[in-house]
Amino acid sequence: DARGLWGGLLVLGKAPSSFKGDVTELQIEGIPVTETAGLYGGSDAADDSGVMQYISIRHGGAEIGEGNEINGLTLGGVGNKTVIDHIEVVANVDDGIEFFGGTVDASYLMVYGQGDDALDIDQAYSGTVDNAMVVLTAASDHGMEIDGPEGSLAGSFTVKNVTIKGASK
């Protein structure tokens, strides 16, 4: 499958996230540090970044540099008033969907043939992922990557009703 034909979708909010040095905002991967529109994080757990439903994100992603990639869907500090459901990510260069902190719930997710992790959780994400399916291909690294907080803010998330089908390599 073709990959990297375009960047990806980034949604940035003002919900709590755990950063090194306990700063309240951070620049998201993939956006130059000179762009203030790339900041995410804050203290509003109920932050509302809108509604994303019935979206297919295909053949995107980019590796800009070491530790600086664009995922199919990047959620940075997105709050729990945001609606995210019925999202499909197909053949992305890096992660399918990555949660950088935040409190948003996401349901009915499908990730197919991503290059790195299908679902990636970082920076004290504190929402729920429910009803997700992951299909790994020979190009895929992992079904999930889960990292803890980077600062003192702790998070507690729930992952339920997830199916991961491995690849034959």
Where would I find each of the regions flagged by the language model?
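Beta-strand/loop edge motif enriched in small/polar residues
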Residues: D1-K169
